[in-house]
């Protein structure tokens, strides 16, 4: 079985990458191909249900290999813990990350109400999953303290500030800014 989809962090900028044939010429295996990308009207839930029908396992249910922090679903970007750090860095630069993206999609599809999407976004969007952060730092050979110092230097302080607990949050989401 072959799943096609976009994985931007790995598909772009791979200098020296070699394109290989996806079918072995001598193979007589039957291959089922499912395209899960920019189809319209695109439905994240339809894609999830179609993938589940052919054996996809998400992180829900009895698969407690990872209880993600700062996410509102357990079926996207689950191949690598570190993926989520990329998403989280959007938050400290722009004030929104993957939670907002998914909440908007689910609201458009009628899975969430607008109020539910806003609440989930405001509650989770600022959180960086600690397991993802550890994995990301380990992959780069840096300490979490070094990572935090880099974030501190590049955070968009027009939009983001630390709350009283030291968490980066959008300024409009808390009353007592450090200022």
PLM segments and residue spans:
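Nucleotide-activated chemistry modules centered on ATP-dependent adenylation/adenylyltransferase
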Residues: 1-179
């Amino acid at each position: 079985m072959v799943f096609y989809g976009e994985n931007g962090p790995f598909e772009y900028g791979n200098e020296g990458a070699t394109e290989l044939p996806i079918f072995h010429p001598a193979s007589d295996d039957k291959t089922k191909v499912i395209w899960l990308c920019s189809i319209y009207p695109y439905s994240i839930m339809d894609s999830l249900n179609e993938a589940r029908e052919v054996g996809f396992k998400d992180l829900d249910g009895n698969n407690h290999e990872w209880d993600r922090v700062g996410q509102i679903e357990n079926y996207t970007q689950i191949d690598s813990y570190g993926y989520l750090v990329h998403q989280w860095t959007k938050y400290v630069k722009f004030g929104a990350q993957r939670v907002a993206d998914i909440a908007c999609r689910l609201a458009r599809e009628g899975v969430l109400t607008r109020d539910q999407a806003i609440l989930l976004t405001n509650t989770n969007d600022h959180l960086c999953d600690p397991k993802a952060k550890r994995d990301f730092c380990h992959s780069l050979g840096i300490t979490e303290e070094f990572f935090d110092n880099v974030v501190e230097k590049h955070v968009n302080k027009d939009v983001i500030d630390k709350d009283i607990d030291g968490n980066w949050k959008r300024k409009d989401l808390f009353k007592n800014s450090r200022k």
